[in-house]
Amino acid sequence: MRVVFFGTPQFAVPTLQQLLDAPDVEVMAVVSQPDRRRGRGNQVSASPVKALAIAYDLPVWQPERLRRDPEVLSQLQQTQADAFVVVAYGQLLPAEVLAMPRLGCINVHGSLLPAYRGAAPIQWSLINGDRETGIVTMQMDVGMDTGPMLLRWTTPIALDDNSQTLGDRLATAGAELLLQTLRQLDQGHLTAISQNEAEATYARLLQKEDFQLSWDQSALELHNRIRGLYPGASLPVQGDRLKVLASLPLGLGLLLSAAYADWQDWQPDPAAQPGTVLAIAKSLGPIVATREGALLLLQVQPAGRKPLSGWDWANGLRLQEGLSLLE
């Protein structure tokens, strides 16, 4: 089976690798977003998908706007591919591209469609505190994630999952599901199912202000946002912003893992002002009052420094019970 792969970020890499490893698949070319400034050094660099393609000596095409690039459109047509596989590419495919391959254009999407159509499904499933998510393969149409669905895979979302751990799990599962989808399509064994438009929701692009959290939010809301926005969510501390990389909501009756059993029934002082240190959990970190419940800071990253445990951070600042982090 001849395929062209469209993808850009790390999330798409396992699917491309799965196709490269499959004995019955020939990857003809890769289409990825143009090189951008990335990482801490803000240097222009190739996307993770392009880097893998280059390692396998595959042709890589990087149109700024696919629909306005006649050369790439012509090259796609000339591949005579059986299918175009699309994973987090970053551009909508025009109708003329969707019509090119024999089996159509197959997309791997990181949610249980029609929920969370759009650019950030993994992040919003965590932010909203969902307990289950998954992967769907679908036959693409001209809309954004609106095409008929083919196969799906589900997974529970754990309380300590974040966008990286959940994204890695979904990426691995999506790679396997995509290969199953292609093989079953090629054999004529799959029937596409239309999405229910009445159940559609959207996962909008994240904005800078989404990452600016406040102690006036509830502990559960803060925890979910810290997980979904990993590793970028921050809270105000002593006139600066502190990135919080891992946390645990306490005092809300949630079932905690065995590692935190000592804090299962702990309750915060309901009169404490949000941002007040309520306790220092030994070997773990500070417990801070919020609008509802309290938040245990397990891993943090002060501005300009490397990540460290909440325990080490609290000891370094000599935090004490009753101290307000807002002062």
From Swiss-Prot:
Keywords noted in UniProt: Protein biosynthesis, Transferase
Record GO terms (molecular function): methionyl-tRNA formyltransferase activity
Family of the protein in this entry: Belongs to the Fmt family.
Catalytic activity entry: L-methionyl-tRNA(fMet) + (6R)-10-formyltetrahydrofolate = N-formyl-L-methionyl-tRNA(fMet) + (6S)-5,6,7,8-tetrahydrofolate + H(+)
Enzyme kind, highest EC tier: transferase
Keyword Transferase: yes
Keyword Nucleotide-binding listed: no
HAMAP family, per the entry: Formyl_trans
NCBIfam families: fmt
Purpose: Attaches a formyl group to the free amino group of methionyl-tRNA(fMet). The formyl group appears to play a dual role in the initiator identity of N-formylmethionyl-tRNA by promoting its recognition by IF2 and preventing the misappropriation of this tRNA by the elongation apparatus.
Naturally occurring in which organism (per UniProt): Synechococcus elongatus (strain ATCC 33912 / PCC 7942 / FACHB-805) (Anacystis nidulans R2)
Protein name (database record): Methionyl-tRNA formyltransferase
Cellular component, GO, one term: cytosol
Disulphide bridges, residue numbers: none
Pfam family name, one: Formyl_trans_C
Protein EC: 2.1.2.9
Gene3D superfamilies membership: 3.40.50.12230
Record InterPro entries: Fmt, Formyl_trans_C, Formyl_transf_N, Formyl_transf_N_sf, Formyl_transferase-like_C_sf, Met-tRNA-FMT_C, Met-tRNA-FMT_N
Binding of (6S)-5,6,7,8-tetrahydrofolate, residues: 111-114
